[in-house]
């Protein structure tokens, strides 16, 4: 039986434990470990109390993990105690790394010269703590002022900074250290594939997977995780290379049953696809209930200025009339949440921004404003192309609270854009 190397993650920080700051390191580290073929046994979040951090390290060690990855607690302040705790856990003396101290001093001097001239020696003394490391550990040069460390042992402990902008660039160097390579030497090499679906319920996918388990030999060799994210289903499958034929058979079954909903077999997100489809085009958005969320999503990608011309948030009826040229008679006859009005909003965006592509959204996100005819969650969408392409208009009833409805509306609009620009027959 093949036994893969096992790892645990300890995310530190009282602000994360209490929910004031979202944990961005734990999920990211989990994905990186899985990519390496290392089995993730545990992930915990604890506050800045040294006793609690040490308790988590001991729990991981008693669980038999080969590698522990920590994040946070590497700063110069009194509550940054992770390094001291790790040294005690690993039975190693704390020593001053003079070379590291000089590197940190150079970084501080550069920062102070540019932003905050002051008493450099006082700041240097305050940051000397960051150059104190467990004897025998390998230093990972800082991205900010906090160095990372890899402390060899059973288990090996990888100590990384808390800010994701510092942790993520440090990861590759941490993995390449001799201590880390030795700790994960027994890893199993996996392939990982991501499928994305839109317009399919989780229960519908679950039924297909049950049928696959009953009909595809070797199905249980696949490790499948499904997640509902932004109104879409993300299905991640990990498998050893010798069972690739099982994954191929599963993918074919999903194509046969859910070909209209399966929009990505290589992990590409709808945002990536739309960026490609908008090459050579110009788009503008007109939004009411989403208040600019669609425009924000379209501009999340670097380089989006090549195809995004602008956006209008026409929240009130007056704004729809004055900014987008919507006929007041349409609003009076059909209401602001209606297909005729949302089509007029899209047409107004085409004209106002002189573009060839427009998307418009108007809806009732709640918690008030719903009626028997148009309950909360009623949202109208239009994607309009000025160069003879299809105009797609839909009215949907979306579930959830105000935030859910607004986010799902944005996702629906993205997929309507995808369909209009790719001119596919299967429109949600």
Swiss-Prot record:
SUPFAM superfamilies per record: CinA-like, Molybdenum cofactor biosynthesis proteins
Family as reported in the entry's similarity comment: Belongs to the CinA family.
Origin species: Mycobacterium leprae (strain TN)
Record gene name: cinA
Domain of life of the native organism: Bacteria
NCBIfam families linked: PncC_domain (TIGR00199), PRK00549.1 (NF001813)
Family matches, as Pfam families: CinA, MoCF_biosynth
Protein known as: CinA-like protein
């Amino acid at each position: 039986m093949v036994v893969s190397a096992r790892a645990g993650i300890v995310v530190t920080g009282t602000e994360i434990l209490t929910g004031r700051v979202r944990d961005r390191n734990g999920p990211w580290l989990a994905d990186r470990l899985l990519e390496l073929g290392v089995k993730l046994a545990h992930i915990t979040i604890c506050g800045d109390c040294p006793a609690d951090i040490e308790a988590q390290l001991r729990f991981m060690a008693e669980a038999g993990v080969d590698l522990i990855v920590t994040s946070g607690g590497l700063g110069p302040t009194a509550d940054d105690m992770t390094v001291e705790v790790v040294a005690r856990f690993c039975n190693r003396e704390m020593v001053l790394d003079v070379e590291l101290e000089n590197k940190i001093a150079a970084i501080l001097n550069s920062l102070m010269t540019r932003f905050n001239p002051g008493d450099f020696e006082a700041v240097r003394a305050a940051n000397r703590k960051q150059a104190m490391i467990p004897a025998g550990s390998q230093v990972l040069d800082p991205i900010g002022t906090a160095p990372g460390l890899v402390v060899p042992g059973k288990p090996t402990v990888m100590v990384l900074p808390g800010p994701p902008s510092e942790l993520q660039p440090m990861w590759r160097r941490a993995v390449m250290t001799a201590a880390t390579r030795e700790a994960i030497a027994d890893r199993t090499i996996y392939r990982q594939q991501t499928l994305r679906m839109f317009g399919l319920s989780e229960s519908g996918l679950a039924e297909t997977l049950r049928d696959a388990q009953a009909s595809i030999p070797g199905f249980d060799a696949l490790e499948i995780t499904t997640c509902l994210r932004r109104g879409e289903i993300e299905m991640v499958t990990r498998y050893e290379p010798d069972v690739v034929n099982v994954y191929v058979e599963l993918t074919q079954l999903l194509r046969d049953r859910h070909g209209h909903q399966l929009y990505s077999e290589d992990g590409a997100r709808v945002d990536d696809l739309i960026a490609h489809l908008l090459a050579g085009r110009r788009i503008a958005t007109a939004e009411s209930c989403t208040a600019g969320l669609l425009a924000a999503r379209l501009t999340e990608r670097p380089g989006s200025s090549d195809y995004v011309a602008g956006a209008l948030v026409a929240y009130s009826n007056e704004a729809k009339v004055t900014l987008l040229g919507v006929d007041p008679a349409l609003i009076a006859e059909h209401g602001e949440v209606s297909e005729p009005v949302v089509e007029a909003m899209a047409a107004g965006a085409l004209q106002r921004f002189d573009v060839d592509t427009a998307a418009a959204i108007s809806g009732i996100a709640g918690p008030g404003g719903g009626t028997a005819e148009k309950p909360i969650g009623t949202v109208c969408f239009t994607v309009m192309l000025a160069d003879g392409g299809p105009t797609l208009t839909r009215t949907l009833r979306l579930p959830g609270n105000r935030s859910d409805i607004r986010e799902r509306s944005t996702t629906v609009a993205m997929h309507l854009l995808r369909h209009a620009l790719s001119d596919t027959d299967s429109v949600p």
